[in-house]
Swiss-Prot record:
Keywords: ATP-binding, Chaperone, Metal-binding, Nucleotide-binding, Zinc. Zn(2+) binds at C12, C15, C35, C38. GO terms for biological process: cell division; proteolysis involved in protein catabolic process. Component of the ClpX-ClpP complex. Forms a hexameric ring that, in the presence of ATP, binds to fourteen ClpP subunits assembled into a disk-like structure with a central cavity, resembling the structure of eukaryotic proteasomes. This is ATP-dependent Clp protease ATP-binding subunit ClpX. It comes from Borrelia duttonii (strain Ly).
Length: 429
């Protein structure tokens, strides 16, 4: 029998509380009623949904590859090929997620994970990090050298996914659209081309373990990390839309490439051969070279997009010190400015810092440690002294550990200064 329009609803349609139990706090409309407590639950659910990061949904407009590269240009010096390749790969990856459903296209678009090959300190990690920040997606870094095959002492590959979940503040659906950078991937190469009698638990075994999560699977991740236990609850995460970027130095890979190219051109004139002189042989990288190096074919197949990074020269390191928006020199300048102290560098000092990084063969990564060591005593003194107004890093202080940067108690620097000074431009002030 239908309820008459005038008939009053006596209880909450959701929880069943009567008007008396709800202390009269019930709102009704037509044939439905809701109590105050249930309305609060609904309000909180809607609020949680609206508070979710915008990246959980399709963005209004994906940055184009040119826009992504332009963003990378602000932070990374050189490495043009890697910046272009990564910009296209990231654009295509998220275009595939937000616009390329099989229902709409009739075609299932497979994801294209990326492999970056280049020396230590050439910018592999920074490229991935800056792209993730620009896309506003969670980002995690993993070290392949800590991973071992399941059942052995070490870290399970699923722990990589836990780092991404943490980066997404526990939001699994947000993490499922993130980016993972696996560093030192060359360190899990097989020990040799032939399978060893002994178990290679940190080489081929890890590659086999990584295959599924890189390709796309539902992985069960222990919430506290470590090894999985039979009765422990796990977090299920779909890796189908997670972009994996793997990087490594691959020492010796250039020789493999050169041997292959030379073998291919036996019998041809030297003028018809590819020029592999200098450090450019990595641009001719092919799958067979990676397999020869020690990566298994199945693993190489999951990383179809390749790019190379050049070894940084002294002139590149000089630019890295001062040119990017968040250059190392600019960071230290602002750090000193927080204590009301001006930081200046002799141009010869910047040259000496770049030269030292070259000698240590640490690339851009070594620049910060050189500056930290150089300025540590000054940074120790500044917070306790109101007299220090200006610090000048000289060439002598870089080259000689017994010479400290010059400390001035007044803002004025005598002119002409014996050495040319580099001063942070007004853009960074």
């Amino acid at each position: 029998m239908a309820r008459s329009k005038s008939q009053k609803i006596e209880g909450c349609s959701f929880c069943g509380r009567t008007r008396a139990e709800a202390e009269g706090k019930i709102i009704s409309a037509k044939s439905v009623a809701i109590c105050f407590e249930c309305s609060k639950i609904c309000h909180n659910l809607f609020k949680e949904e609206s508070d979710k990061p915008a990246s959980n949904k399709a963005p209004r407009g994906l940055p184009t590859p040119k826009q992504l590269k332009s963003h990378l240009d602000k932070y990374i010096i050189g490495q043009e090929d890697a910046k272009k390749v990564l910009s296209v790969a990231v654009y295509n990856h998220y275009k595939r997620i937000f616009k390329g459903s099989k229902r709409e296209t009739g075609v299932e678009l497979e994801k294209s994970n990326v492999l970056l090959v280049g020396p230590t300190g050439s910018g592999k990690t920074l490229l991935a990090k800056k792209l993730a920040a620009e896309m506003n997606v969670p980002f995690a870094i993993a070290d392949a050298t800590t991973l071992t095959e399941a059942g052995y002492v070490g870290e399970d590959v699923e722990n990589i996914l836990l780092k991404l979940i943490h980066a997404a503040n526990g939001d699994v659906s947000f993490a499922e659209r993130g980016i993972i950078y696996i560093d030192e991937i060359d360190k899990i190469a097989k020990k040799g081309e032939n399978v060893s009698i002994t178990r290679d638990v940190s080489g081929e075994g890890v590659q086999q373990s990584l295959l599924k999560i890189i390709e796309g699977t539902i992985a069960n991740v222990p919430p506290r990390g470590g090894r999985k236990h039979p009765y422990e609850e796990t977090i299920a995460i779909n890796t189908h839309d997670i972009l994996f970027i793997c990087g490594g130095a691959f020492v010796g890979l250039e020789n493999i490439i050169k041997k292959r190219i030379n073998r291919s051109f036996i019998g041809f004139s030297s003028s018809s051969c590819k020029d592999t002189g200098g450090d450019n042989s990595l641009k001719y990288l092919e799958m067979e070279d990676l397999i020869k190096f020690g990566l298994i074919p199945e693993f190489v197949g999951r990383l179809p997009v390749h790019s190379y990074l050049d070894k940084l020269e002294k002139k590149d390191l000089m630019k890295i010190l001062v040119e990017p928006e968040n250059s190392i020199v600019r960071q230290y300048y602002h750090m000193f400015k927080m204590d009301n102290v001006d930081l200046l560098f002799e141009k010869d000092a910047l040259d000496a810092i770049a030269e030292e990084a070259m000698l240590k063969n640490t690339g851009a990564r070594g620049l910060r440690s050189i500056l930290e060591e150089l300025l540590k005593d000054v940074m120790f003194e500044i917070p306790s002294s109101k007299q220090i107004k200006k610090v000048i890093v000289t060439k002598d202080s870089v080259l000689n550990t017994n010479v400290e940067p010059l400390i001035l108690t007044g803002r004025h620097v005598n002119k002409p200064w014996a050495k040319e000074l580099y001063e942070i431009n007004s853009k960074s002030n």
